[in-house]
A protein has these predicted regions:
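Metal-dependent catalytic cores of enzymes that make or break cyclic nucleotides
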Residues: 3-198
Length: 198
C-alpha cells in the first residue's frame, strides 16, 4: 500500500526527522507510526476526505506517539506488561504529545488529533472519556489503525497475532471502541490495508 499524501505536505520531511529521533529511542514506535500513518492515509482516501484532510491525518499518524518521548525508559522500554503505576504514566503520552505540538500554530489541529487518539467510541477511552463524534475524525481513524498495528506486530512480551484474530477483534469492537464507519471501511478493505504484514 503506497500513500500519496507525503509528497505534498510541506512539513513532511520535518515530521520524518522527529519520527526518526523517536525511532532511535524506541524502534517499535518509529516503524509503528509509519505503518499507522500509511493505513490512516488509505482510510482517509476511502472516506473521500479532501487531500488536505487526508494529508493532515497522515502526518498525525506519524506523530501520534510523539508524547512517548516524555515517558521514562523504564516504562517505555520495559520487556513485559506494565504494572498499574507504569500504565498510569504511559497513558499520559497523548497529553504530552498534544502539549508539544500545540506550542506551534502550524500543528494546532494535529495536536487535537493526537490528544484524542486513545479515546473510544463508547466514551471509555482516555485521557478525557470523549465519545462518538466528540472525538476528532482523524483520531477515530488513527485509533483503528493503531489497534491493528499493535495487534499485528511482534512485541517484547508476545508474538504478532494472526491477521484473522486482529480482524475479529476489530469486528467485535465496531461501535464500542471504534467509529462504526471507520471500522467497517477497514474491514471491507482488510487485505489491502494489512498487506504490509503478509
Amino acid at each position: 500500500m503506497n500513500c500519496e499524501c507525503e509528497t505534498d505536505y510541506e512539513y513532511h520531511e520535518f515530521v520524518e526527522c522527529i519520527t526518526s529521533a523517536l525511532d532511535a529511542r524506541d524502534p517499535y514506535t518509529g516503524k509503528h507510526s509509519e505503518r499507522v500513518s500509511d493505513m490512516a492515509c488509505f482510510i482517509g482516501e476511502l472516506m473521500g476526505l479532501t487531500e488536505a484532510e487526508t494529508q493532515e491525518i497522515h502526518i498525525a499518524g506519524h506523530l501520534h506517539d510523539i508524547g512517548k518521548i516524555g515517558i521514562p525508559d523504564r516504562v517505555l522500554l520495559k520487556e513485559g506488561k506494565l504494572d498499574d503505576e507504569e500504565w498510569k504514566l504511559m497513558k499520559k503520552h497523548p497529553e504530552i504529545g498534544a502539549d508539544i505540538l500545540s506550542k506551534s500554530s502550524h500543528f494546532a489541529r494535529l495536536a487535537a488529533i493526537i490528544l484524542h487518539h486513545h479515546e473510544r467510541w463508547d466514551g471509555k477511552g482516555y485521557p478525557f472519556g470523549a465519545k462518538g463524534t466528540e472525538i476528532p475524525l482523524g483520531a477515530r481513524i488513527i485509533a483503528v489503525c493503531d489497534s491493528i498495528d499493535a495487534m499485528a506486530s511482534k512485541r517484547a512480551y508476545r508474538n504478532a497475532l494472526p491477521l484473522e484474530v486482529c480482524k475479529a477483534e476489530i469486528e467485535k469492537n465496531v461501535g464500542i471502541m471504534y467509529d462504526p464507519e471507520v471500522a467497517r471501511l477497514a474491514l471491507e478493505n482488510w487485505d489491502k490495508l494489512t498487506e504490509v504484514y503478509r
